[in-house]
Amino acid sequence: MTTSKSQNYLLKLATGSGVCMSAFLLTPEPVDANICSLDNPLSINVMGCYKTPDRYVVKILEMGLCTSNPLSGTNFEGSTCTPTYTNADGVEIDVAAGAATLTGGTSTRPASDIYPHAYVKMANTFGLKGSYQLNSNTYCSKSDGTADATPGCTAQNFTETLRSFSGRCSNPYNTDDAKASEVLTEGTMSARLTNSSYVTATDCDATHLVGALALTNSVVIDDSTAGLEVQFTVSNSGMTIIPTNNNGNVVGQFAGGPFQAVFSLY
């Protein structure tokens, strides 16, 4: 197992082959996963639609591979996991901006083995920015995530914090509010909202997010494997455009959408 300071751990954002992990993001309303289309204003529908954001900043603290599911129990259990990248303070990267570099952390080559699971640990805050043209009107994100329809507007940065997968903080906070899962082509994705010790949240006060993927096809590390590359993409998915009415013809709010992280061997 080889460990080194990761000063040039490249995150390629182009589409590529590898292990795909979809992360979950909170939107203020349930969203039908339509892709926004300028050619079809009805694509926004009453529930909203997805588009590529101008800015999508995430803070990564750890990524790695596991020989068993780290989220099979109530909390994250990493005893069978090998971190491929760690940074105790976290490193912020703008996934929407193109190639980014994970700096200040430690990169580790996993031992030769078969890994049926992959995971990522991150902060539960997301830095976003975007705009959308609908019915000849351009809407821009404001600093609180609401839409600015002023002619000639400029999109502003805003921050979204994920505290519940249900889109609301129940009273009392339900255990289902802190977890989510989805069956993907690449495997079954699970996610948990946690505290800084990666204990699953029991109240609306989460500070971190963990995602784990039970892979359809395991990652096989052998002696010829030099390491892992990670690719992120938010194309047609990283931002949610939310209308103000049932007709879906006026934009009221911008929110986060899902992104994907892809682990590739080299």
Where are these regions (language model features)?
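Conserved anionic group-binding/transfer micro-motifs
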Residues: 7-10, 26, 115
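Intrinsic disorder/low-complexity segments
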Residues: 15, 24, 146-150
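C-terminal segment of classical bacterial N-terminal signal peptides
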Residues: 20-30
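A short, solvent-exposed, low-complexity linear motif enriched for acidic/polar residues
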Residues: 32-266
